[in-house]
């Protein structure tokens, strides 16, 4: 599960994890888990936290190490990709609402997100997602890419 995270996500999670690993022993207590997840934009309920902790804390010692934490976050992030959120995200990229994301639309959104990409990088992103080879991304291709991350 954690192998589907990007290096950037892993670095971000490591940073957050370290903030709460007060004594630097590589473990955080179950109490701290909620705080860590909230700092990363997740909003788990108490019941969800308890379930996650029970799932992850195999030996029941009340602490979670970094590999366990990564698996937890990867699972949590996958769960948040609901159909409705994917449709909304696709609409954001598909500026002219023609049902396709073009290289220009992709570049526009990425620039607005603060990502300065070269034409080559944008073309590469399109190529990776463009299953039918028409030079743009349709909704099915978009969903495939989003679910694979």
Swiss-Prot record:
<feature type="binding site">
    <location>
        <position position="130"/>
    </location>
    <ligand>
        <name>Ca(2+) 4</name>
    </ligand>
</feature>
<feature type="binding site">
    <location>
        <position position="98"/>
    </location>
    <ligand>
        <name>Ca(2+) 3</name>
    </ligand>
</feature>
<feature type="domain" description="EF-hand 1">
    <location>
        <begin position="8"/>
        <end position="43"/>
    </location>
</feature>
<feature type="binding site">
    <location>
        <position position="61"/>
    </location>
    <ligand>
        <name>Ca(2+) 2</name>
    </ligand>
</feature>
<feature type="binding site">
    <location>
        <position position="57"/>
    </location>
    <ligand>
        <name>Ca(2+) 2</name>
    </ligand>
</feature>
<feature type="domain" description="EF-hand 2">
    <location>
        <begin position="44"/>
        <end position="79"/>
    </location>
</feature>
<feature type="binding site">
    <location>
        <position position="21"/>
    </location>
    <ligand>
        <name>Ca(2+) 1</name>
    </ligand>
</feature>
<dbReference type="GO" id="GO:0030234">
    <property type="term" value="F:enzyme regulator activity"/>
</dbReference>
<dbReference type="InterPro" id="IPR011992">
    <property type="entry name" value="EF-hand-dom_pair"/>
</dbReference>
<dbReference type="GO" id="GO:0005737">
    <property type="term" value="C:cytoplasm"/>
</dbReference>
<feature type="binding site">
    <location>
        <position position="136"/>
    </location>
    <ligand>
        <name>Ca(2+) 4</name>
    </ligand>
</feature>
<feature type="domain" description="EF-hand 3">
    <location>
        <begin position="81"/>
        <end position="116"/>
    </location>
</feature>
<feature type="binding site">
    <location>
        <position position="25"/>
    </location>
    <ligand>
        <name>Ca(2+) 1</name>
    </ligand>
</feature>
<keyword id="KW-0007">Acetylation</keyword>
<dbReference type="Pfam" id="PF13499">
    <property type="entry name" value="EF-hand_7"/>
</dbReference>
<feature type="binding site">
    <location>
        <position position="59"/>
    </location>
    <ligand>
        <name>Ca(2+) 2</name>
    </ligand>
</feature>
<feature type="binding site">
    <location>
        <position position="94"/>
    </location>
    <ligand>
        <name>Ca(2+) 3</name>
    </ligand>
</feature>
<feature type="modified residue" description="N6,N6,N6-trimethyllysine">
    <location>
        <position position="116"/>
    </location>
</feature>
<feature type="binding site">
    <location>
        <position position="32"/>
    </location>
    <ligand>
        <name>Ca(2+) 1</name>
    </ligand>
</feature>
<feature type="binding site">
    <location>
        <position position="27"/>
    </location>
    <ligand>
        <name>Ca(2+) 1</name>
    </ligand>
</feature>
<feature type="binding site">
    <location>
        <position position="132"/>
    </location>
    <ligand>
        <name>Ca(2+) 4</name>
    </ligand>
</feature>
<feature type="binding site">
    <location>
        <position position="105"/>
    </location>
    <ligand>
        <name>Ca(2+) 3</name>
    </ligand>
</feature>
<feature type="binding site">
    <location>
        <position position="23"/>
    </location>
    <ligand>
        <name>Ca(2+) 1</name>
    </ligand>
</feature>
<dbReference type="GO" id="GO:0005509">
    <property type="term" value="F:calcium ion binding"/>
</dbReference>
<feature type="binding site">
    <location>
        <position position="96"/>
    </location>
    <ligand>
        <name>Ca(2+) 3</name>
    </ligand>
</feature>
<feature type="modified residue" description="N-acetylalanine">
    <location>
        <position position="2"/>
    </location>
</feature>
<keyword id="KW-0106">Calcium</keyword>
<comment type="function">
    <text>Calmodulin mediates the control of a large number of enzymes, ion channels and other proteins by Ca(2+). Among the enzymes to be stimulated by the calmodulin-Ca(2+) complex are a number of protein kinases and phosphatases.</text>
</comment>
<keyword id="KW-0677">Repeat</keyword>
<feature type="domain" description="EF-hand 4">
    <location>
        <begin position="117"/>
        <end position="149"/>
    </location>
</feature>
<dbReference type="InterPro" id="IPR018247">
    <property type="entry name" value="EF_Hand_1_Ca_BS"/>
</dbReference>
<dbReference type="InterPro" id="IPR002048">
    <property type="entry name" value="EF_hand_dom"/>
</dbReference>
<dbReference type="InterPro" id="IPR050230">
    <property type="entry name" value="CALM/Myosin/TropC-like"/>
</dbReference>
<feature type="binding site">
    <location>
        <position position="68"/>
    </location>
    <ligand>
        <name>Ca(2+) 2</name>
    </ligand>
</feature>
<feature type="binding site">
    <location>
        <position position="141"/>
    </location>
    <ligand>
        <name>Ca(2+) 4</name>
    </ligand>
</feature>
<keyword id="KW-0488">Methylation</keyword>
<protein>
    <recommendedName>
        <fullName>Calmodulin-2</fullName>
    </recommendedName>
</protein>
<feature type="binding site">
    <location>
        <position position="134"/>
    </location>
    <ligand>
        <name>Ca(2+) 4</name>
    </ligand>
</feature>
<feature type="binding site">
    <location>
        <position position="63"/>
    </location>
    <ligand>
        <name>Ca(2+) 2</name>
    </ligand>
</feature>
<keyword id="KW-0479">Metal-binding</keyword>
<comment type="similarity">
    <text>Belongs to the calmodulin family.</text>
</comment>
